[in-house]
A protein has these predicted regions:
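Non-catalytic accessory segments flanking enzymatic or RNA/DNA-binding domains
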Residues: 1-111
């Protein structure tokens, strides 16, 4: 198992769009975005730990592809709450295959 994070980033300059991605370090990931924006408007508004975060991201992207800015993009024109629920659904699906004592709890950050 590779523990990492699924996250949602927003930027007030693009209020209807969210970015969904993965990382093993939320702070350094946010800093890479901030260097491209002189106003530092990117915010991680939601994240959760997931033992199989890269595979979960692939499934999320598949379910959200019709909201994407471009085919291989990570920016989606989708309501923040809907995007958040897509991340949580992936953790629920992962947990459904585990015995009760091994289930992963949602541990998240919200802005």
């Amino acid at each position: 198992m590779n523990n990492g994070y699924l996250y949602i980033i927003t930027n007030e300059a693009f209020p209807e769009w969210v970015k969904v991605g993965t990382t093993t370090n939320l702070i350094s990931r946010l800093h890479t975005y901030q260097t491209g924006d002189p106003f530092r408007r990117y915010r991680i508004v939601y994240s959760l730990q997931h033992p199989e975060f890269r595979e979960a991201e692939k499934r999320i992207k598949e379910t959200m592809k019709h909201f994407a800015l471009e085919i291989k993009g990570e920016w989606y024109k989708i309501d923040l709450h809907m995007a958040k629920s897509r991340l949580e659904e992936q953790l629920d699906e992962y947990n459904n295959a585990l015995p009760q004592q091994e289930k992963v709890k949602i541990s998240c950050l919200m802005a």
